Every structure is written in structure tokens, then in C-alpha cells.
Amino acid sequence: MADAEDIEPLVCDNGTGMVKAGFAGDDAPRAVFPSIVGRPRHTGVMVGMGQKDXYVGDEAQSKRGILTLKYPIEHGIVSNWDDMEKIWHHTFYNELRVVSEEPXVLSXEAPLNPKVNRESAQIMFETFNVPAMYVAIQAVLSLYASGRTTGIVLDSGDGVSHTVPIYEGDALPHAILRLDLAGRDLTDHLMKILTERGYMFTTSAEREIVRDMKEKLAYVALDYEQELETAKSSSSVEKSHELPDGQVITIGAERFRCPKILFQPSMIEMEAAGIHETTYNSIMKCDVDIRKDLYGNIVLSGGSTMFLGIADRMSKEITALAPSSMKIKVVAPPERKYSVWIGGSILASLSTFQQMWISKGEYDESGPSIVHRKCF
């Protein structure tokens, strides 16, 4: 690694909805853009206009009228490697403008997906010729960012949610649980319940508008039934929202009905436990001796935990499930939207971490399987 000392490592958190990327040592990612690759629907329509064969991120978003948009990451797992390569290329050369020496790369991935980690190592070393790389589990990085090494992380993004118990820096794989319910489902649900008010949002462009509404206005009610009563009898929960075309719409109970499905997936015909129960089940799969440490360090992470009121509700629900004398603490760091990336930035900057990198030499010697030996 001596030759790469002079250039800061890159930290890249590949999310279903957004890619967060930047340099180790920074306190926030420099590039945050949608994980989208768009290809022209009709080739030749834009000849002579400098048309590219593919667009990534914000540019794909702004030209979506003439493109077919694809999300290469589904439910946190890469499903299209060619497109993923385009996203990384865009990240390194257009967003972060990495020139001359190739930097070492710390890539953050979802838990429980071994194949992906091998593939990403292969692309990093063989296509991008990085001198060194490391693959870290997203939730573990969020825990580091909160200043802990033991705790349970509920990481909920756009495509998938996970509960990951971590003891002294190591994730406990047998107790990790995955819930295929996250931000995109919440946006879809809000689109659906807005139709009851007569507001129709159907296209992918309109979905972005609803996502924006969700992020600005939705909140989690501490007592759902009581909140519904309040909403029926007064207009205190009503808020107006201006659409891009200037039209103003009003939403009320939808504001807390939308994130309710995180706690009650059955509302959208989904047979799964809510985030509180999934967290509890994860804790119960751990050794009885460490449960107290987990209950006392429940850390929220990811964009879909940004709702106002979610920590209080989570605390209330888990207190109801846990043994009565147990001390429950739910931590919702203000920067949790980016805590995976921040944890990666911290980790890649540590002097003690420098011997953890997988070097190009080690990769050439043992192939992609080295990822499992060194990273997990």
C-alpha cells in the first residue's frame, strides 16, 4: 500500500436509491446521486446532438423523457453488473474526478450477499485497476459512525431494510434479518393513498414528486389510532405542498399513514413483521448474555429512518416486547441518512485499518474469494 499513501481512499456506499461517494477523511459524501442508468429509447433520434449511449444519475433523471431508466441495484443487491460498472465509472471520473493515481476503494455493501462482494472486487481490480479495496457491511459502518462497536442497527434505505446485531465490531450473521420493505414501498403507498383524495400520481416523474412529499411531510405517530381521531376532528395535521407546476395540494392523515407500514407491513398485504418486531427477533437470535447491550444500543440508519417520531415509536414498541426490567435505548443520529458513508470515511482513515486493505497483489494471487477471507 506504500505507493497509494499520498491519495485519499474513495468511500462508496451503493444504495438502491442513491449512490453516496467521496473521500476518506471528509465528514460528508461529495457526490450523492440516484442509482439510475438510462438508455435512449430510440437510437438515432438525437444523432448529432452528442448523444451518449447511456446516462447516469441526475443526467438520466433530467433526460428521462427520452430514456428507459433502470435501477441496477434492487433490494440492496446488484442485479445488473454492466450498469453497475457504468455507475462506478461515473462516480470515479465524472463526480469525484479521480485523475492520475488510482485510489484504494472502500465499497459498502448490503449484508448477506456473498456473490456481490466477489463480483465487485473483480470489477474494481480488473476494470478499474485499483491498487487496493475493501468491502464493508453497511450497518457495521453506521454503528462505527455512532461511536459504538456493539449494538443493533436497523438500516432502512430505499430498497431494503436489515437488522444487524454487532458485537465488538463484528456483525453476527446468524442473527441478521432482512425485510424487503423500505423507502420505495413507502413512496408507492403514499401514491396509492393520495388517489383516495383524488390526486393521481402514476409516472416515474410523478413518483419523484411523491417521494419529495414523503421526505418533507411524512411522520410517525406515537399512537396511530389517536392520531387518526385527531386528524378526523381537526385540521391540525393538514399541510399544503406546492407541486413543481405550481399547483398546491393538501395532505393530512396521509402524512402518518404512509410510514405506518414500516410497523405494520400487513397494511400493504405483506406477510412480514414490522421493523420493531424484526429488531426484537434479531436480538432474540443472539446469545442471551449480549442482549442487554443490544437493547441499550439500538441505532437507526438510512434514509427511511428519517421520519420525525420514528425513534419514540420504536422505543415504545420494543419496550412492549422486551423483558419488563430491560433498559431500552433507541439512538437516531441526526446525520443517519449518510451514516453508512460517514462510518466508511472514519474506517478508511484509521491507521490501524491500513493493513486490512486487499491489495492488487493479494487479489492476483488468490482471486475474488479473498474478499471473504479478509473482509467478513
Curated annotation (Swiss-Prot):
Biological source species: Glycine max
Family per similarity comment: Belongs to the actin family.
EC id: 3.6.4.-
Keywords, in A-Z order: ATP-binding, Cytoplasm, Cytoskeleton, Hydrolase, Nucleotide-binding
Underlying gene: SAC3
Record PROSITE patterns: ACTINS_1, ACTINS_2
Catalysed reactions, semicolon-separated: ATP + H2O = ADP + phosphate + H(+)
Pfam families in UniProt: Actin
Additional detail: There are at least 16 actin genes in soybean.
Role of this protein: Actins are highly conserved proteins that are involved in various types of cell motility and are ubiquitously expressed in all eukaryotic cells. Essential component of cell cytoskeleton; plays an important role in cytoplasmic streaming, cell shape determination, cell division, organelle movement and extension growth.
Source superkingdom: Eukaryota
GO cellular component: actin cytoskeleton; cytoplasm
Annotated compartments: Cytoplasm, Cytoskeleton
InterPro entries, sorted: Actin (IPR004000), Actin_CS (IPR004001), ATPase_NBD (IPR043129)
Protein name per UniProt: Actin-3
MF-aspect GO terms: ATP binding; hydrolase activity
